[in-house]
Curated annotation (Swiss-Prot):
InterPro entries: MFS, MFS_trans_sf. The keyword Nucleus does not apply. PANTHER family: MEMBRANE-ASSOCIATED TRANSPORTER PROTEIN, SUGAR TRANSPORTER. Residues 1-46, 90-110, 160-184, 238-318, 388-398, 447-477, 526-530 are cytoplasmic. One of its GO terms (biological process) is visual perception. The keyword Ligase does not apply. Belongs to the glycoside-pentoside-hexuronide (GPH) cation symporter transporter (TC 2.A.2) family. It is linked to Albinism, oculocutaneous, 4: A disorder of pigmentation characterized by reduced biosynthesis of melanin in the skin, hair and eyes. Patients show reduced or lacking pigmentation associated with classic albinism ocular abnormalities, including decreased visual acuity, macular hypoplasia, optic dysplasia, atypical choroidal vessels, and nystagmus. This is Membrane-associated transporter protein.
Amino acid sequence: MGSNSGQAGRHIYKSLADDGPFDSVEPPKRPTSRLIMHSMAMFGREFCYAVEAAYVTPVLLSVGLPSSLYSIVWFLSPILGFLLQPVVGSASDHCRSRWGRRRPYILTLGVMMLVGMALYLNGATVVAALIANPRRKLVWAISVTMIGVVLFDFAADFIDGPIKAYLFDVCSHQDKEKGLHYHALFTGFGGALGYLLGAIDWAHLELGRLLGTEFQVMFFFSALVLTLCFTVHLCSISEAPLTEVAKGIPPQQTPQDPPLSSDGMYEYGSIEKVKNGYVNPELAMQGAKNKNHAEQTRRAMTLKSLLRALVNMPPHYRYLCISHLIGWTAFLSNMLFFTDFMGQIVYRGDPYSAHNSTEFLIYERGVEVGCWGLCINSVFSSLYSYFQKVLVSYIGLKGLYFTGYLLFGLGTGFIGLFPNVYSTLVLCSLFGVMSSTLYTVPFNLITEYHREEEKERQQAPGGDPDNSVRGKGMDCATLTCMVQLAQILVGGGLGFLVNTAGTVVVVVITASAVALIGCCFVALFVRYVD
């Protein structure tokens, strides 16, 4: 056993706790270059998000989508994501692919993003070339475009959970924190580049004339960036399949051994058990002791048991999910209506006037400036994610979490009360603070919770382990699906508020109020590990 564990390229990483079957294992320190490569997925994802934000409304309008169907487009994707995120997250915890647990899901969702972009940016052009009947052409163009938007949104929202779980699987605790900061950094860079390319008038450039329309130009760039970024990401750090843990290790029955999860690990809080093939031999021996029992456990994991695990999650996980929901509700309330706010309130344009009127042209100018504001948000998100590494040593995760919500709440409040072009653009930098906070701090807290639970198991080896089917994939997915729930709340509630108040100012004020409520929640209810 000892000689096998000492083979080249395979080292044992033990905790400082007492030796025993509950020893944690720590993957090696990852080079910064590998963490940057891992973060390229966030760059590609956010680039494509920015392209969608800039072009999806013009695309939907150009194909003739009735306004009555808008709600279906924006509701279907988050509803599907909210229902399926924990299911797929748990399935990835138990995936036995030879390529690892997370990468097969990331690759599949990346392909779905690419197909979705191809459908909503090129679908109408392809349909026009294939169908001559005007009525059938309209129906098919709308259908293909809607399917593309829903497919892209679903995959892009979904993929964040597996990417985070992949990072947690293969990195040490310190590298997880560094990796999350790099994720936020490249998220901002990707969004900024996407908004900048979307602001270029491609119709008057050679590339635009060569490819046909600006929609095809943006698909070319999106497909290129997404393919390159995800290829680099998937090759960044290797994953060991779960079956490799038990390879070449004889089974050893122990009557008092606690039940194992389907992947041969003590499931709840399993973030530090076996990662990237670096195996504690005593732990691996227990993990391999009864393969048939593990397979039966995996097959017994039903949707009912999964929902039970979600309902019975520990209170500190539940509070973290609620705080994440509050934060994303505030953030999306502002971001989804920000360009319209700039056009109508700051520039005092009218989107409902004739398209050749002065009021409509002023509104369009406001929308363009609003896009530059979103670009400022992305740039400052990247900058703040870099400074987070310095700030966390002074104010901790609680200070970072509270500060992000507070600055966003105050900034959006000032924008709503005093709408001015220059002050609004300056305050857009605070949107970036909130964005970086939402992408890093909650997931840092997840790693802290898992690390704390691992230490508790080491200190009490005779205690009963948690028998739930929870794992880090499910925890990341549950946290991520709060984004979909926030989209559902925003899509269903803000339209009613705007119609009732008669102005989009209510959107910005609502975002400010929700963020300030979130300040109180993260300070009073979210638990922080010392």
